[in-house]
Amino acid sequence: MMEEAASSVAWWWWLWTWRSAAACVLVVVADALWWRPRRLEAHFARQGVRGPPYRFLVGCVREMVALMAEAASKPMSPPDSHNALPRVLAFYHYWRKIYGPTFLIWFGPTPRLTVSDPELVREILVTRADAFDRYEAHPVVRQLEGDGLVSLHGDKWALHRRVLTPAFYPDNLNRLAPHVGRSVAALTERWRAMASAAGGEVEVDVAEWFQAVAEETITRATFGRSYDSGRVVFRMQGRLMAFASEAFRKVLVPGYRFFPTKKNRLSWSLDREIRRGLVTLIGRRSDEAAEAQHDNKGNNGGGFRDLLSLMINAAGGKKQAIPVADMLEECKTFFFAGKQTTTNLLTWATVLLAMHPEWQDRARREVVDVCGDDELPSKEHLPKLKTVQYTASPSHPHFSFHLHHQSSINKQTTE
């Protein structure tokens, strides 16, 4: 009898413990997915800040996707409009007309306060900048873009910035001009061949072609003389961009990226290959740098300084100032941050030149006058190409310029 009573007590104790744990988990989940979003909605509503209503788990994502799909399904109106905002951020354009310049939207259970009033934006970015941190990206996007300079903080950010800044000095970037010129010349020759084969005229998607030019330039800026090896690695990272783009449009379900789905397994495999390739490349370049220093040939003779060589040589022969893992992340960040933005700039500038042929003529005449009929632009030519620089500048009257900046509130400020 005593054994049966003890067994019964133990069974009831385990049952009570299990139910209590389940109840606690349920309360935590309910608070994260329902009560907390509702409290935040009420908090902002009392301050006069409203927005589309929060829906359990998905937030406003369904409405966002629907608005973006609708905007992408039809051409911009009018066709020669430079107002790209209704197309690029259709949900923001739509809700701003309803809720005003400041409103609340939901990416799943995560709120985002959108602000477009210039004075309030200035206060956030300048006057009270210490109260805000950098925005923490979607985990899949963060895996792709790397934990590099754009997401670092404090002393580590200062170290990386100091080491990498020389790569962006004008004198150093000018040394890339011949490589970029040859890439663009090869691109135009292929277009000429395609046009000749099609009877003198052909339609091309310039965005796809410009991606190749941007990728080649960024790879050379990152890896320098190890261009061929770096290109293989960055091509794999380009494949990962499709997964990140898709994930960014979905609700972030905690832990979902750890499930062995088909796309997750492919993403993991690509990430492993990228890391393995970068580690091998960094190791080879580190050995070359050590041998060069041993032979007193550490100076590059005034040549181009790529990002990888700057990070490897940062410690001046002592213990590495930037570990290999951080070098890997910086390489990923630079490729992710530079490729798409450069492609978009070139594509939009080309569209604007097509819409305004008079600027084409002015830029073409300037290039011929400065560089000649057959000579590629060099670093000596670049400062003289004023009209060409102006056509790709946000200050150009035909450029539509929109600022999109994301920040998160510092936790210490909210406590």
What annotation goes with each model-predicted range?
Residues 133-144, 152, 156, 175-344, ...:
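Cytochrome P450 heme-thiolate monooxygenase catalytic core
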Residues 75-100, 276, 377-415:
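Conserved cytochrome P450 K-helix E-x-x-R motif and the immediately C-terminal K′/meander segment
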Residues 3-145, 153-155, 159, 181-189, ...:
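N-terminal membrane-proximal hinge/A-helix region immediately C-terminal to the signal-anchor transmembrane segment
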Residues 1, 11-16, 291, 296-299, ...:
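Compositionally biased low-complexity segments, especially N-terminal hydrophobic helices
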Residues 30-34, 46-47, 225, 314-325, ...:
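Cytochrome P450
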Residues 1-9, 407, 412-414:
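C-terminal helix/juxtamembrane-tail motif
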Residues 164:
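Acidic-aromatic/histidine active-site loop/patch
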